[in-house]
């Protein structure tokens, strides 16, 4: 990990600081702790133009998936700190399942969807897609639909699962088939 005395291999515009958090997986308490640490760091080391980037995988596995989704869907979780939320493979599968893709629904149930549905107050063994849609707030679905694959800061590129070799970044950013997120 770089500290303030090491030279960075990339470049950010003057006054810009990036905070990046990956793979939250429904761990709301830990996310709150990380956000508090960022607030403390900004207080102790002010900077003109900070940004927070969540790198995807907000759902599945952890105990507070619905809470994490509610916090992120509500907008910038730290007042005054612009936030970018990226698409992870778990969000992609969840969204596809909620939009009626039966294969995605099956995959999702075996890769963390059970925990997600339980967090929303459902028994995944007893409920159908229509029940899922009744319990998952529309704001959470719209949040999922609005997630992007990658984000650039200076000459850094942030993505959940990496970059496809041999494909120009601009082509990847505009790529409509989000199922390629791994």
Regions found by a protein language model. Name each.
Residues 153-166, 175-177:
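Acidic, glycine-rich loop-and-strand cores that form catalytic or ligand-binding grooves
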Residues 25-26, 91-92, 163-166:
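Short, solvent-exposed loop/turn segments at secondary-structure junctions
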Residues 13, 177-182:
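Acidic, His/Gly-rich catalytic cores of divalent-metal-dependent hydrolytic chemistry
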Residues 12-17, 151-157:
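Beta-strand-turn-beta hairpins that frame and shape the catalytic cleft
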């Amino acid at each position: 990990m770089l500290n303030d005395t090491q030279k960075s291999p990339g470049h950010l515009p003057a006054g810009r600081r990036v905070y990046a958090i990956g793979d939250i997986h429904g761990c709301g308490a830990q996310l709150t702790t990380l956000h508090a640490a960022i607030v403390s760091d900004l207080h102790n080391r002010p900077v003109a133009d900070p940004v927070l980037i969540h790198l995807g995988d907000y759902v599945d596995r952890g105990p507070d998936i619905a809470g994490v989704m509610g916090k992120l869907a509500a907008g910038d979780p730290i007042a005054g700190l612009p936030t970018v939320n990226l698409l992870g493979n778990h969000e992609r599968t969840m969204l596809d399942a909620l939009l009626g893709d039966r294969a995605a629904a099956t995959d999702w149930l075996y890769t963390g969807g059970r925990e997600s549905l339980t967090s929303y107050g459902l028994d995944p063994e007893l409920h159908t897609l229509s029940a899922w849609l009744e319990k998952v707030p529309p704001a959470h679905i719209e949040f999922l639909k609005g997630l992007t694959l990658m984000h650039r800061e200076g000459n850094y590129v942030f993505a959940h699962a990496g970059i496809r070799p041999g494909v120009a970044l601009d082509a990847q950013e505009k790529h409509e088939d989000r199922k390629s997120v791994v």
